Swiss-Prot record:
Cofactor note: Binds 1 Mg(2+) ion per subunit.
Binding site for Mg(2+): 461, 463, 465
EC id: 2.7.7.6
Amino-acid positions noted as binding Zn(2+) 1 in the UniProt annotation, renumbered to this chain: 70, 72, 85, 88
Protein name (database record): DNA-directed RNA polymerase subunit beta'
Amino acid sequence: MNELTKFTNQLAKPETFDQIQIGIASPERIRSWSFGEIKKPETINYRTFKPERDGLFCARIFGPVKDYECLCGKYKRMKYKGVVCEKCGVEVTVTKVRRERMGHIELAAPVAHIWFLKSLPSRIGLLLDMQLKQLERVLYFEHYIVTEPGLTPLEKFQLLTEDELLEAQDEYGEDAFSAGIGAEAVKFMLMDLDLEQEKEDLLEELATTKSKLKPAKIIKRLKVVESFIESGNRPEWMILEVVPVIPPELRPLVPLDGGRFATSDLNDLYRRVINRNNRLKRLIELRAPDIIVRNEKRMLQESVDALFDNGRRGRVITGANKRPLKSLSDMLKGKQGRFRQNLLGKRVDYSGRSVIVTGPELKLHQCGLPKKMALELFKPFIYARLDAKGLSMTLKQAKKWVEKERKEVWDILDEVIREHPVLLNRAPTLHRLGIQAFEPVLIEGKAIQLHPLVCSAFNADFDGDQMAVHVPLSLEAQLEARVLMMSTNNILSPANGKPIIVPSQDMVLGLYYLSMERQEKTPEYIEEKDGTKIEKLPRFADMAEVHQALETKSVTLHTRIIARVPQADEDGKPEMKRFVTTPGRMLIGECLPKNHKVPYDIVNRLLTKKEIGDVIDQVYRHTGQKDTVLFADAIMVLGFRHAFKAGISFGKDDMIIPDSKEGMIEDTKKQVADYEQQYQDGLITQQEKYNKVIDAWSRCGDQVAEAMMDEIKSQKFDKDGKESEINSIYMMSHSGARGSPAQMKQLAGMRGLMAKPSGEIIENPIISNFKEGLTVLEYFNSTHGARKGLADTALKTANSGYLTRRLVDVSQDCVIVEEDCKTDNALEMRAIVQGGSVIASLGERILGRTLVDDLVNAKTDEVIVKAGTLLDEPMVKAIEEAEVQVARIRSPLVCEADQGVCATCYGRDLARGTPVNIGEAVGVIAAQSIGEPGTQLTMRTFHIGGAAQLNETSHLESISDGKVEYRDMPTITDKKGRILSLARNGELAVIDAEGREREIHKVPYGTVLMHKDGAKVKEGDRLAEWDPFSLPIITEQSGVVKYQDLIEGTTLEEQTDDATGIAQRVVTENRATGRKKKEDLRPRLTLLSEGQSEDETEAQRYLLAPGTTLSVTDGQTVEAGDILARASREAAKTRDITGGLPRVAELFEARVPKDNAVIAKISGKIEFVREYKAKRKIAIVPEEGEAVDYLIPKTKVIDVQEGDFVKKGDTLISGSPNPHDILDVLGVEALAEYLCTEIQEVYRLQGVKINDKHIEVIVRQMLQKVEITDGGDTVLLPGEQVDRDEMDEANAKLGRGKKPATGNPVLLGITKASLQTRSFISAASFQETTRVLTQASVEGKKDTLIGLKENVIVGRLIPAGTGAGMNRMRVTASARDAALRAQWKKQQEKLAAADEAAMAAEKEPEAEVMDADAMAAAMGGDSAGGDTKPEAPEASEE
């Protein structure tokens, strides 16, 4: 027995295994775990509280209830350890064994395991090739099944009712065939299966099948059959003969007072199983009638089902209080299940929580810890110190002292706490800056003090927030806390590399106030000798004089002065320089570190919040961390002091309502009335009127706001030239301390348009502002949107958290594994330009990335930066100055590292500003960076009327000087002399003087081009414009128009606008009427050249989609360039712009959008093949090769006409592109670019900056899988989805001359990707636990514990950060062990070769669970490396 405890405990140490395998337990395996059979349903005796013998809590099976004491009390105490009492049969040992010993129930009839039956796809069903419905009929005793048809005409696996069975037996004789019912029959069929034979049959069928749908089904079955063969699981183990019973301490029964018991639901479920099982045994012994026995067997099957997974089949079994009982599956599932509640999240000792208050006098690395809390948290350390100092003799005395809080204790607490960091955490911890380390400073009171600058990282405010404190105990933990987690080491945000320790609110206001200039009197000028005029200003020699002048009030903080400011030169020597500045700015300048790279100029300006952030950024880049921290602390103190000294406040008169407001509102009202009139006259539609009204009012609101801002900003001077005080509200808003122009607009401008909860905008705006007060109606209108905002916020938090969870799950195992993967692939980066303005410059996008090619200055041909360099700020500046347009960089997307990313592809660690370290968990950082701002995103989908959204995108302006170049763009000049583009996918490029492309735009069909090809343009020139609301059909030659298949009433109707009475001819959809076969009507316009008759085929045809408005009449003569018809772009007009969180989730989940665009898969000419009832088929015919067909619903507007030439990747039907199509047609880089741009778009609208590389890391994780197109000579099957690594492994195993497998990359959404990771532990702890575990156990999966999550679950250091080094050491150590072991084996074999008989004897135990050497190693460490894990046999062979 001692061996056994030694052995089990040995296994319990987490270091002793390398992988975890999951499989299906055989009945023998279950019996071998068990310490005895449970025969009775009793639990404990209600009077004595002792467990009943042979019951569910039996002490004989599971172990003693009290430590070292048998049940009857004959043997007590340690000395009898290991004795088995002869009276009660209980072994004397620790009671802890009741947590680990299992029992079992021998079933009187086999039952099917519900997981393998009902978890879709049903494994039993796939193996037997039966439908689940039929299987259930057999298992639940409704039908018989023919297991052996013999010579009868019955089919194998045919279902028979009882009557049919009797008939068949009468007809063919009882012994001619065999049929069974229930789990016994299924078990017999499973035992009968010959898996190898089945596999051969399936492979043959796969090779010969002709149908399209068959292969998928065959592959499914084949995979199950193969996984059974490979894993060594036997199919019949899916049918249970023995049910294991988990240890009693894991399903406790606790007596409550009053003689009642609180019990775990599992006990009820087990009791049910035992009762039914015993009843069944008795019935079988009594030879009861078949029907009774069968019913009892069915009930047994149902009770075992409920035990394993209650509610999976049939009714949920409920307890006494009508609550469903929690089955074994429920114990694992969900947030409260074993995985997420106990393995991934645990409660922590040595922790406390309290309210936080601000601590402005703290240094950045400190926090105030209440004495009471510290005393409790550091207790063990205090005891140790008291003992070491010899102050207290015993632990008891030490405890007393601490409880009495004697003064010695406080002194010792001070010693203990010194230099011992504590961790502070504010929930919700959305990113890694939500837990930071500080050095505690003991304070009176009961609240924790927090340094104001770290609030933004914790997202904390002091309105009652609470924070938790944790104490790192071990030396290593303290070291990590100090070196990695100290608040001073987290100055930059990991999401975007910008400082996150930035003053906010009061501090910003104080600094802004300090850095302002205010004119005291009209400036006087002195004329120099050379005639230049210099302003006459007070001059100061140094800071001391300035201080004195301020004290004597001879200057104010804002007076313009000339002063000498000490600067450091390149060698660090001080030198004095003159600056025109103000005393206030000099105070800020005093805080700057003395460094020649940080000149006084950077604070010699008006400092807003953004500017202060830039200053801190520059200080950090040039002078390092220590100086930055000192600087940050200094300006914090300065900011607070001067905000308080300035005494800035505002009253109602500071909100100035502009006088021009009335006039603007009157004008707008006139305009709106005008639009109303136009609508009445039928010149515009209802939708257009709505758009225009909304447009007019939003313009009016902006104008009022602008007038108000001008009024507030304006500087007024009195007669002496003294400037009036600056408006306080403006100061607060402009400095970035509090408030925004939008809020000021509501206070003193006009509130503007409001939205309904549906997201639509109400046409009547709120004209008043808060200063004037709202009318009742206006107030009511505004409550609408406000209430929705509050409801949204609640939903948002949950949604955002779930998105973060999915992101973390998909990317958790993405870690930096090596320095450089040496790949040649790269991504092309260029600036993002939208609507003529640069949104993200090239420099911003490539900062901190590794270059792939040399970057060359186009003008001078010199190399600016060499390939392979990590770009830092100065290099990026040089690149931007040389106006480089495109750079190729390394990216996590193209990295070829195994099981992670390499440092070169990732580039700079944003939170440190240095190259990333090996072991950095970049996946988790990426997930947090994207998920953390999630709560700031909106939840709503915007329904924006066309005008408001699309008026910006109806023209193009040039962003640079250069010449225009049209690519693939045929044009035509109409009779007005305008140049029209006839290209579906033409590009308009602007080329500068050096021949570099400055911008490339795709312009829609029918665009009016402003310039001839090759014309010179200046920055800001208009290049093109188009109508965003309709898609024209333009004639390319002159001729006569003929209507074809345009029949009044069927395909053409005159639509009159109700309000206006103006008629338009609109093509309608033709629905087949009557019985007769519908004529195939293809409404189209044909253009005949003059003098052509209709049957000649040269005519141009234009097919019309339903909803097209005709602009010409039948037989009209038209010129080239005329518009024949307009297809309304209704789709684009009020397309809901899915905004915010839902959009981000949609992109990451790789969902196919609702109206998805159709993309051309190849280049070629368009041909309309034929029409069907609701669809039309069009084909793209390439110059060589096969045509590709598309089926397109007739209601969709097709962007191309017959005969057009399209390029691969062009859109045939506009809409949101489908990411899967982009991947198939245009490849990985295009997809990454698309996802990055789209996701960044959402965040950019909210003003959130996230570095592209985080999105790239997630997209990389979504592209891990490939779909096999050709299995080659490997075991992989075409159509199967496997990890890219798996495909590479399979190919690597092939010999020479064999054909490797090939595959295409597949895009998986984040949820799907998480569920398909190679680690089943990680997948099971994410979602759909039962499904994942069922699948894994069938395949006999091994979890190699590579990712972070699996290691947290089994309780190890994670293989990232400081754990990465340990991990590498473990791997090398185990490799050496394996080598030594192999050597030792060889020696043993040599010795054994002498003695054949000994060898035979040695073989037997080796077939046990572990091979003998691994066993020996596990017992007592082994020859080489102490307790490094014994290598699994396969690994040592590799």
